[in-house]
Amino acid sequence: MDADKIVFKVNNQVVSLKPEIIVDQYEYKYPAIKDLKKPSITLGKAPDLNKAYKSVLSGLNAAKLDPDDVCSYLAAAMQFFEGTCPEDWTSYGILIARKGDKITPDSLVEIKRTDVEGNWALTGGMELTRDPTVPEHASLVGLLLSLYRLSKISGQNTGNYKTNIADRIEQIFETAPFIKIVEHHTLMTTHKMCANWSTIPNFRFLAGTYDMFFSRIEHLYSAIRVGTVVTAYEDCSGLVSFTGFIKQINLTAREAILYFFHKNFEEEIRRMFEPGQETAVPHSYFIHFRSLGLSGKSPYSSNAVGHVFNLIHFVGCYMGQVRSLNATVIAGCAPHEMSVLGGYLGEEFFGKGTFERRFFRDEKELQEYETAELTKTDVALADDGTVNSDDEDYFSGETRSPEAVYSRIMMNGGRLKRSHIRRYVSVSSNHQARPNSFAEFLNKTYSSDS
């Protein structure tokens, strides 16, 4: 018997077939550099920086920026941001720099140039006759890179969220060591004219390069990162959520995964922890692999590990975390089942801790405590393990164990308890729910059952 087939009758004729559905047509690609060459892009001819500054600033004021010119200028302006490498810097077998080397952002990557001249038009008129200073270049670079961050902000953020961020960014780039070069609200006005610039590969690449540099190198102009920080772990929300989750519940990755009681986690856990990646290497190219073009479709995104992502945020909702309540549900990854498991895990980790004495007045007190603890352990091992209580919460002698939680779920037939539903409704009903968020899902799914 073929386990994948179903049998039924059509007009008295027996039909046997294998139902096939649309599968994920994308191939997840792991970031890797196999040829020992730094990530690279190709831009037009390197400009005269004074001419380029005046042209790009003019375009910023007129809200008419040329993306090719902006990228060419950003690459050329890297020379203003020299710093000292604090340690030998290697990633994927490539020596980026040695300890003590003087480096700039373009030391991290390879920027190839053609002979094609840029436009360098003065769309906003000629406002600056003298040559710009380094603080003026730094301010322009900071404002341009901030267009990346603004274009990554989702439309679901309500009110004046984006405008407020744009105003705060402008304030950063008009105070020392930077200098005011644009009028108030210029950044937001210009952003509206280039709202999708985060999808331009070269602009994204340069934002990631600047971010990787300033995240490691102490520099006067490190605040430029305010516009590029979103390139760090970009499209890695699944892996980032898991990392935050294990810190939140105070378990190791191995201990946490033991609580993942569902077959759909198997493929995702294998995908997320593929051997050979530099996930744990500080300042690796891995951190910026999406912006540097090292992977087409991230295997670490919320969609790639949707069941894990859903579970983590249902647990977060149970614990009242605003970030989880606002996160977007991955609708195709069993959210109803994940909400059930999330309720049990939320109960297990919420309002409950594992505590022990770790500090003592002197060595004698420490030794007495350790001796007493050993005696307790011996007594526990000698116990025949008989449980006299019918209360499922005392089903296991160990307060935090996968076995105890799994037993509770099985005893309840894989359904949520009333107390879980009340908690879910309580946290979600007091929250202004965004469309397709976990708060909205919990409200719609469980509010009638409370």
Swiss-Prot record:
Pfam families: Rhabdo_ncap. The keyword RNA-binding applies. Keywords: Capsid protein, Helical capsid protein, Host cytoplasm, Phosphoprotein, Ribonucleoprotein, RNA-binding, Superantigen, Viral nucleoprotein, Virion. SUPFAM superfamilies: Rhabdovirus nucleoprotein-like. GO terms for molecular function: RNA binding. Belongs to the lyssavirus nucleocapsid protein family. Encapsidates the genome in a ratio of one protein N per nine ribonucleotides, protecting it from nucleases. If expressed without protein P it binds non-specifically RNA and therefore can bind it's own mRNA. Interaction with protein P abolishes any non-specific RNA binding, and prevents phosphorylation. The soluble N-P complex encapsidates specifically the genomic RNA, with protein N protecting the genome like a pearl necklace. The encapsidated genomic RNA is termed the nucleocapsid (NC) and serves as template for viral transcription and replication. This is Nucleoprotein. It comes from Rabies virus (strain India). The lineage of its organism: Viruses, Riboviria, Orthornavirae, Negarnaviricota, Haploviricotina.
